[in-house]
Amino acid sequence: MDIVTRAENRRQEALLALDRNRQSELGQFLTPLAVARIMSSMVRVPQGKDNFYILDPGSGTGILLATMVDRILSKHPKAKIHVTAVETDENVIPYLRKTLEDCKSLGVHTELITQNFIDWGISTSKQYDVVIQNPPYYKLSANSPTVFSLKNIGYIVPNMYSAFMALGAELLKPQGYQIAITPRSWMNGTYYTSFRKRYISDLSIDKIHTFESRSTVFQESEVLQEIIIVGAYKGSVSPQVELSVSRDQNHIQVTRTVPYGQVVTDDFVFVPANYEDDKIVEQVNQARENLATLGLQVSTGKVVGFRLKNLLLSENIIGACPLLQPTNIATGIVEHPKYDSKKTQWFDTYNETSSKYIVPAGTYVLIKRFTAKEEKRRIVAAVYNAAEPAAFDNKLNYIHCSGEGIDIEIAEGIARWLNSDQVDAYFRVFSGHTQVNATDIRRIPFPSDSQLRGLAHSEDPGHDIVNILNIPKEVKVA
């Protein structure tokens, strides 16, 4: 029985013995064998190299180390391998020790660190050729020691998995390679902006692996986040990125390469899973404007209901103005008041603090920040033509011009553009979640002023959008 099979048997044994609630508290999800094999296969193993220093932070039972050692020895049987496993969970360390003993029996030099990875990693002078990791998943408070430790080396991290990624990058030798399986969420959004910019300036992403089904990646542990594997090395930017996708843990459906600039930008990381995604990014980028160049802005509604209960009104009494909620919006349509809604429909304008929550009368494009599971689209937009001042709930974004309404033709054109199949597909490529933030909308390309006005009056906006994007007739968006 080889070391990988034995390591997998230990992982299965540990899964049965470990307490699920404690695993959740630790953010611990043991890597399935098939996923570990994918990860180790993605690592660059240079020809002619005979010394390898490997680090596995948060090693668990050691399945990643085992598959990495197995891969290197299969290519370089005489290689000298040094592995460092870092693990603090006393419940899995006995399994990890046995995996390290198996590695040692093959001539591998092993080291087990039972110290907190962040504390150890900040203080060590060691550097590695390979960092392979499945880091813990949980948020960090702003005053967490981990946050301060990482800030001292120039990284702003909002959670533990980004902290592990950041420190892993710091511990790489020049041309060293890091492979990490994490939630996809770090690739876009303001929450990760600082971390993302620093990470992609320190490392060059050259491989990304995605899974079509969220639930099959860590199905034993019921992880439902969108998970992604990213490989990156400490060196000059790669001209291309290799993209691969699995339908489940065991089957790599397709691998292809795309130009680096189509995946990694200054602001975010696109993850086009297939050729159709590549095409939709290329097509939507034919639209050359954005909100800023159109002279418009997008903001998030200012009314947070539970904080302003004293200003919420159940009836349209004197001094009330409309309060727009997500339930008031369907694609292209605003219904207010919505009498069958359980959400408050009116807002008190007579309070001395009310003015800062209210927008002037005018035309606005409202966009849901969150979409329900039953809604087919990520982006749901509608035009609201306000004859009087109004208030917008915090679960809505709204497009405006310096805090006031916008031209009604432009508003109609923008709503039709945002509700199009093409923009919906484009948004899915760069966003791994259903939340639509104001930052996301600022990044979306838009047609010109004249094209938006044309869309507003179009009898067939879908056809006109195809023409704007120069899409060949045979190409369709699913």
Please identify what each model-predicted range represents.
Residues 24-25, 29-38, 58-66, 78-80, ...:
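Signature of N6-adenine DNA methyltransferases within the class I
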Residues 282-477:
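Polybasic, glycine- and aromatic-enriched phosphate-binding surface used to engage nucleic acids
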Residues 1-77, 84-103, 116, 121, ...:
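Class I S-adenosyl-L-methionine
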Residues 76-77, 124, 201, 317, ...:
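Extracytoplasmic/secreted proteins and extracellular or luminal domains
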Residues 20-25, 54, 148-151, 360, ...:
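Glycine- and acidic
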Residues 76-79, 237-238, 373-374, 405-407:
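Short, solvent-exposed loop/turn segments that connect beta-strands within catalytic domains
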